[in-house]
Regions:
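Conserved Rossmann-fold NAD(P)-dependent oxidoreductase catalytic core, especially the SDR/UDP-sugar
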Residues: 1-27
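Glycine/proline-rich active-site loop of Rossmann-fold NAD(P)-dependent oxidoreductases
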Residues: 30, 55-66, 73, 101-112, ...
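Conserved beta-loop-beta element that borders a ligand/cofactor-binding pocket
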Residues: 34-58
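A conserved pocket-lining segment of Rossmann-fold NAD(P)-dependent short-chain dehydrogenase/reductase
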Residues: 69-90
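A conserved structural motif in NAD(P)-dependent oxidoreductases
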Residues: 88-95, 106
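Mid/C-terminal beta-alpha module of Rossmann-like enzyme folds, strongest
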Residues: 98-152, 197-199
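Conserved C-terminal active-site "lid" loop/helix of NAD(P)H-dependent oxidoreductases
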Residues: 127, 147-174, 190
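Amphipathic terminal alpha-helices
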Residues: 178-199
Length: 199
């Protein structure tokens, strides 16, 4: 069994590794890791995969399409503060490969990071979105983030760099597909038919 959580809440502001424990008191979703470890202790071959803030690629219905829709609706592509906070990301095909390896080869209780881009400054994400939508790129003050981004403001403000070095060493997994910025540059995120997210 493979449990999915995420890297964003593991160690905000510092590079999260596979050896960092989730503080399940800080967010209910992280309690899934406690459950996975309990199953592993009972002999169930359970592992944990932690993707980053963006699992990207064609058909993405995650946070990046939400940011694009917010930019379209607001008429600007924004980042928060100086935009130096970092988002980790992985291409969906690389993530799928990691899940397969985890199912096949992971020892009970193992933790893996589905991370290719260890930490992309959110300003870079906003700049690519602004360029493709031909919109100004602006900074939003942290106290105004919720007014501008709605529920997404909390997530876009997180500084959550992460590493997958131990995952690559232990499973032989190597990200082979485009990083998030290069994937955005292809343009498929900005096609009219790609707008499927309600802000």
């Amino acid at each position: 069994m493979v449990i999915t959580t995420g890297t964003a809440l593991i160690k905000p502001g510092q590079v999260a590794t596979e050896e960092d424990s989730a503080d399940s008191d800080s967010h209910p979703r992280l309690r899934a890791e406690d459950a996975a470890k309990a199953f592993a202790a009972r002999g169930v071959r359970t592992s944990i995969v932690r993707p980053g803030a963006s699992v990207h690629g064609e058909g993405d219905h995650g946070f990046v399409p939400v940011l694009i829709d917010i930019a379209r609706d607001k008429g600007v592509s924004a980042y928060i503060g100086d935009g130096s906070n970092r988002w980790p990301a992985v291409h969906r095909l690389d993530a799928a490969h990691l899940y397969r390896l985890a199912l096949q080869d992971a020892p009970a209780g193992a933790v893996f990071h589905a991370i290719a881009d260890g930490g992309i400054p959110t300003r870079e994400i906003a700049e690519v979105i602004g360029r493709h939508l031909e919109l100004p790129v602006v900074s939003i003050a942290p106290q105004d983030a919720t007014d501008h981004f709605g529920w997404m403001g909390m997530f876009f403000a997180i500084d959550a760099p992460a590493s997958s070095a131990l995952t690559q060493e232990r499973l032989g997994w190597r990200p082979a597909h485009l990083g998030l910025i290069d994937d955005l540059e292809l343009g498929h995120y900005f096609a009219p038919e790609a707008r499927t997210v309600t802000v």
